[in-house]
Amino acid sequence: MKNFFTFLSILIISLTVYVSFNDLIPSSEKSLDKYDFSIENALDHLRIISKKPHYTGSEYHSVVRDYILNELKNMGLETEIQNQVVTRFCCVGTNTSNIIGTIKGSSNGKSLVLLTHYDSRHHASFGASDAGSGVVTILEGVRAFLSKNTIPINDIHLVFTDAEEIGLLGAQAFVKNHSLVDNIGLVLNFEARGSGGPSYMLMETNGKNGVLISEFINAEPGFPAANSLMYSIYKMLPNDTDLTVFREQANINGFNFAFIGDHFDYHTSLDSFERLDRNTLIHQADYIMSMLNHFSKINLSNLDSENDYVYLNFPILKMLFTIHTHGYIRS
């Protein structure tokens, strides 16, 4: 009998772990049907964007910039190219060309930013995952959002930064010099450090995370992949994103959505269209649609909190979180 219960315990633990990881990523694009997000449209964009390396200063970098700008104009957005010379430390600098598109909201409250970078890493990488996946997630996500004839309450700014790969220079140019920064309430940043696997939510905040976690769960992502241990480790790592610049230099809260599977593709010639996992792109699509629908209509003026939450993924229920000694389960 003792052996039976030991076996049963191991089986339950094994099944729990399996279901936890299996539930982290969608296996079909059917989950996107309610949003009208087309993976095929996104992949069509990506074929063009990742056709050649497009590092800052390269010929194809200009092609990608113009392509994104034209797509924003075709959707009827207000558009802008922010040209700015930026230097980092004593000897790193370049002229950056950030692409900005705006959807006007119905109120004068804080705005929402959809963020990614459009430059690829040096001459070898095709930049399909890092961060072409972010570019196409935003382009197709906004098209799907607008197709519902939804008028957001908050202004929505699409910011495609330049020169991320050589020191987050485009993000610095935007945060230090653009007037839009003063009214930003939240940033959603789409990134990659590999070519597949689940996309994890990693926050950036200078304060406590209670309200941010609550609103993340209220957005009802279909496949939330997040836990506070991963967040704690992330904060100790030296790898910053564009979102880090917003937090450190402007005290703006935000969420990173990033995948790290097949990490050996990162910053190499293997970061190609063919290597990007389709299900990973579907996961990013689920995030942007759920987050966009939610955060475009809530008050973003105060996302600060008096509490820190401990949170983790949980089978079936999706996420479990705890505030001090009080436990809550949200599905």
Where are the regions a protein language model picked out?
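Acidic, Ser/Thr-rich low-complexity intrinsically disordered segments
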Residues: 1-4, 8, 303-331
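Hydrophobic membrane-insertion alpha-helices, especially the h-region
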Residues: 4-20
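Soluble extramembrane regions of membrane proteins in the secretory/endomembrane system
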Residues: 25-320
